[in-house]
Amino acid sequence: MSPPPADLDPASPDRSTAAGPAPAVPSSGRPVIPDDPPLGSAIGTAIADERSGPWLSATADLPEAALLHPRRAFVSQRVTALRTRIAEIAELVEVPDLCLYLTGSYGRFEASPYSDLDIFFMHKGTFQHNALLPVQKTLIDAALIRGCRDLGFPELTGGGQYLRIHYLDDIRSSLGGPQDDAQNFFTARMLLLLESLPLYNDALYRDVIRAMISSYYRDYSDHEKNFRPIFFQNDIMRYWKTMCLNYEHRRNRLPDDPIKHAEFHLKNFRLKFSRLLTCFSMIIAVVHLSRRAVLRDSELLALVLASPWQRLIEVARDTGSRSLLGQMVDLYVWFLDSTAAPKEQCARWIADRAIRSQAFSRASEFGGLLFTLLQRVAEGTDALRYLVM
C-alpha cells in the first residue's frame, strides 16, 4: 500500500505499509508532506503505523479514541488478507492503469464481520480509448468474487453488479455536469476522497487522488495568497444533501410493509452517524487547517489519505477539544456496537419504537457535537457563511 505523505493520521490501520521515520512537524502544527513518499508492498502490523506520519504519537496519546482501536485492528487484518489475494489475480497485471479501492465501513476503518465490501475500480484514462475487453473484466471479476468468498466476506452487493470500472479522465471532464450524476461519477469521486482505502496498485491510487484534487485547485495559481478550497467544500456539501434527498425520495415509494419501514429507519440511522462523519470530518479539518494559511494541495492529499476519525482526532488535539472528542467517540462506538449484526437483525432492533426513539436521540446528540466542533474551528472566520451560502 502506498503510505500517505506524512498524513494526518492518528494510528490507523492502513493506506500503506513499511513505515519510515516520521517527518518533523513544524511549530505551526501543519503536516509536512513529501512530494512522493516511498511506496510499501505489504501491510501486516505496519498497517497500523503507516498512514500516520508524525501524527501516530498523537493517537497513542489520546485515550479518548482507544475504543475505536478494535475495529481498526479488524480492518487491518481483513484488508491484508484481501490485498494478498487480489495481488494474485494474473489478469490485473495486463491492465497497469487500473487500481482498486475500498469505501464504506472498511474505508472508514470501522467494519465488522457483517460489513459489506464496497469495491471500486478506477482506470487512469477514458472509456472511449481505454475500455477493458469484456473477457478481461469477466476474468478479473470472477477471481475477485472467488477470493472474497474464500476469505469469508459477505456476498458482494447485488451479486457484484456495482463492480463497474470508472475512468478518471471521464470523471474529471464531467465534474459538475449532467453526466456527473447520470454515470455515478459524483459518488465514485466523493467516496474516493472522503473514505477510501487502496486494495491494488497503490501508486496509481495516489496519482488518481492527486489528479482529482488538482481539479479543485485549478484556480490556485491566480489566488496563491488567499485561495480557499470552496469548490471542494461545495462538492462535499452537495454530496451530503444528495444523500439526505435520496433518502426522502426512497421513502415516497415505501410499500406498506413494517420490515421495509424498519430497513429505512436503519438507513436513516446510519446516515446520521457514518455518512455525517464521513462528510463533516473533512469539512471540519479543511476549515481548521485553512485558518492558519492557504491550504495547499499536498495538505489536502494528507486529509484524503486520513480516515474520518483521524481527521477529527488531530483537530480535537490541536484545538483542545479532547473532551468533546471523547463524547463523540462514545456515541459512535455505541452506534457501531448496535449495528454489528446482520441487516435483518438490525432492522428488527430499530423497529422497536422505544429503541428507535433512543437511537435517533443519540444520533441527534452526535450531530450536535460535530457541529459544536465545526463552530469551534470556524470561530472568528467566515467559513460557516461559505458553507451555507
Predicted regions and their residues:
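N-terminal regions immediately upstream of nucleotidyltransferase
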Residues: 1-96
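Active-site nucleotide-donor binding segment shared across nucleotidyl transfer reactions
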Residues: 83-132
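Conserved aromatic-histidine-acidic binding/catalytic patches
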Residues: 67-70, 74, 112, 124-132, ...
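Conserved nucleotidyltransferase catalytic core and NTase-mimicking acidic/glycine-rich helix/loop elements
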Residues: 2-7, 26-56, 203-389
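Amphipathic alpha-helical scaffolding segments
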Residues: 117-127, 135-141, 293-303
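Intrinsically disordered, low-complexity segments enriched in charged and polar residues
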Residues: 6, 12-17, 22, 125-130, ...
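Conserved catalytic core of two-metal-ion nucleotidyltransferases
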Residues: 73-93, 129-232
